[in-house]
Amino acid sequence: AYVETSPEKATEELLAINFLPENYSSLSFSELLAVLTGNVLAEATTRQAKDAKLAEFAVDDQTDLAAFLLDTPTAITASQFANVALQLLGYHPNYDYSLTDPLTCGEKHALPAFKDLTSKEELIFAFYRLLNTRSKNGQILLDVMAGKGYFTQFWGEGKFMLFNGKSLPVFDTSQVIREVVYVQSDLDTDGDGKGDLLPVTVFRPVESQDQLKVPALYTASPYFGGIIDNVKTNHNVDENLTDATTWTNPKYVAKPLVKSPAPSGQDVPATELATGQSSYGLNEYLLARGFASVFSGAIGNRHGDGIRITGSPEETISQKEVIEWLTGDRVAYTDRTRRFETKASWCSGNVGMTGRSYLGTLQIAIATTGVKGLKTVVSEAAISSWYDYYREHGLVIAPSECQGEDMDKLAEVCQSNLWDGGNFTAKKAYEAEQAELLAAQDRATGQYSDFWESRNYRHHADGIKCSWISVHGLNDWNVKPKNVYKIWQKVKQLPVESHLFLHQGPHYNMNNLVSIDFTDLMNLWFVHELLEVENGAYEQWPKVMIQDNLEADKWHAESDWANDLGQASLYSPTADGYLSTVENGTGQLTFTDLGGTEFKKAGISETDWEYQFISGEKKWAKASLRFESEEFLHPTTLVGRPKVQVRVAANKTVGQLSVALVDLGTRQRLTATPKIFARGNQPFAYRFEADSLQEFVPDKATKAKLITKAHMNLQNYQDMKQPSKLEAGQFVDLEFELQPTYYTLPAGAKLCLIIYSTDQGMTKRPLETEDYTVDLAGTALLLYRK
């Protein structure tokens, strides 16, 4: 995130933040070195206190900084300055590095190169670069200073301050305004004849109370009002498959509209204090830097009106209406009486969006409306089609660790206004809506329908007018990677600035990873998009950045994420269990699917089952066919979406087929989730919220790792959107894509293709066994290899 800066500009910025004293030109080299080093020590509040602390820093293995300065040096060597710099950055001499070889430590941690400093000009620029360098705690040194109170000297000035293109924490976090308003919707989802009131929580700098207008970071969070725990009532998945031709193509039916009044000239200050807490670290970080943080769950949320209708156009409309209030185009009231209007007069009219999972999903939904004022989205782990979240290729497919969840259950989780005991209108309407969702989502057949079509945001991507950042985990089996892959294929073709980050996590945030300065990049991004400052953000990093699965500190810069990043390679499974690039398969092989019976007997978790299954444990072998490649002689990277063709017959008139690609070979792999190195060690500002430094690290050796997988209903052999009759013993040709990937197989690894039926963590788990016969002559795997 460091923006290349001229020495002249660096000097100007250092003067502006009172780091470089006005009289610097009259100071000697040694005096300036003492002052600049002392200024980093923000916890020392007087010059005497700062000078006293200089003796705590070693220049080499014999001399402390105070003693070094007594000789009034006119220069400092690269090694000496590196020692001082590393200690200022939080590294411990003799523990983290040797005082006799600090340059090696700098190289190890990818710090800027140190050099001999022989003039005051070089010294000043070296400190400018140092302030922009990441410390041991993962933050740039300037942010470490902020956590110690350096920028409290600017509290109350009521203006943004920028440094290296990024906003500084100069806003008084001890006096943040926390308020609630009620936006009136055009929707009447609870059927009471009035527009639903949508509670909106605002956290904004106290400085915005006067003349300063600030941009807003809006997080559309259905969870903000609270979460109703209903896991125990999730749908039963231990049931036999249903004939998909009973499908009736459930329709989407729009809710009635009640036109809201236009905003008047009235503007009464908010009268309700916010008791809810910000739930997103990036927002808190940027709140201290002048960006208001706005949260709303919209329809169905606590203290508000309406009914949660998961993924529906109504959900999109209600969340969009919050932005319309922020830009002055919609009415909001101080309370539920609807008597006094209140405006977002503090807002500049520039809005960005943040959030992960459902919160990221609603960014996509709102962006497709092209709503005025929305300048950018940073959408993490987002659903781009609800069918791709709860279904796949004609099957009911659960998100990871959410077996039995569906649209109706998620709506219940987020219907927090049910906790408002007096809201009898919501309760009655909610029960009716639950019945409608249960019927329309069609858990019996799993087929695509008009209901799901209305919940596919990708079909409205042409409406996107704002800049775009997508963030997703390549190992996210909750919101599976094709959600981001398929919206990316749309967005990259639009005339908007767009970027993509892919990390090695599951359903996870990446803003505090050691290996990338993501938070600083987002600071730079939002300054450009919402403060409208030309700071080079668009050119600062590549179009696509992908974290390596072998070395967590390596990120690949790519121009795109698509099949054409690689070359097509065709593999054929053979009767003797090989996955071959030179031999075509012949003959037929049969496996017996056991449904969920053996899994239930084993009494293990879905995660444990998956590891045992992909590792090839014998007790699961009967329920699959496995084909292994030869060992790879060189590292090989798979990109894009693998495709399989399987000619298969089942001994029943229904069937489900699953396919997995697995990396085989006992070795250390990265942890599934990042390891936290120090909890709460990254303060966002002075005496404010904090985050924890973390990263993926090598874990204990494992036998196998899932690369990607997919599932398909045998009855969709003719059409993915139209089921057909299936006869017992009838061979059908299935062709479908697996989840997209970017995965490097190291030398010595084997690639394994597994063909099976019941996926215990995702598919239904039939109560009966079923035989599947695969015709190898009609079966192949297409990969894209870099």
Swiss-Prot record:
Location of this chain's protein in the cell: Cytoplasm
Reactions catalysed according to its record: Hydrolyzes Xaa-Pro-|- bonds to release unblocked, N-terminal dipeptides from substrates including Ala-Pro-|-p-nitroanilide and (sequentially) Tyr-Pro-|-Phe-Pro-|-Gly-Pro-|-Ile
SUPFAM superfamilies given in the database record: alpha/beta-Hydrolases, Galactose-binding domain-like, X-Prolyl dipeptidyl aminopeptidase PepX, N-terminal domain
Keyword ATP-binding set for record: no
Keyword terms: Aminopeptidase, Cytoplasm, Hydrolase, Protease, Serine protease
Keyword Cytoplasm: yes
InterPro entries in alphabetical order: AB_hydrolase_fold, Galactose-bd-like_sf, Pept_S15_Xpro, PepX_N_dom, PepX_N_dom_sf, Xaa-Pro-like_dom, Xaa-Pro_dipept_C
GO cellular component terms given for this protein: cytoplasm
This enzyme's EC code(s): 3.4.14.11
Residue positions of the active site: S357 (charge relay system), D476 (charge relay system), H507 (charge relay system)
Main location: cytoplasm
Gene3D superfamilies: 1.10.246.70, alpha/beta hydrolase, Galactose-binding domain-like
Entry's Gene Ontology molecular function annotations: aminopeptidase activity; dipeptidyl-peptidase activity; serine-type peptidase activity
Domain of life: Bacteria
GO biological process: proteolysis
A Pfam family reported for this protein in Swiss-Prot or TrEMBL: PepX_N
Coiled-coil boundaries: none
Main function: Removes N-terminal dipeptides sequentially from polypeptides having unsubstituted N-termini provided that the penultimate residue is proline.
Annotated family: Belongs to the peptidase S15 family.
Quaternary context: Homodimer.
Name of the protein this chain belongs to: Xaa-Pro dipeptidyl-peptidase
Organism in which the protein naturally occurs: Lactobacillus delbrueckii subsp. bulgaricus
UniProt gene name: pepX
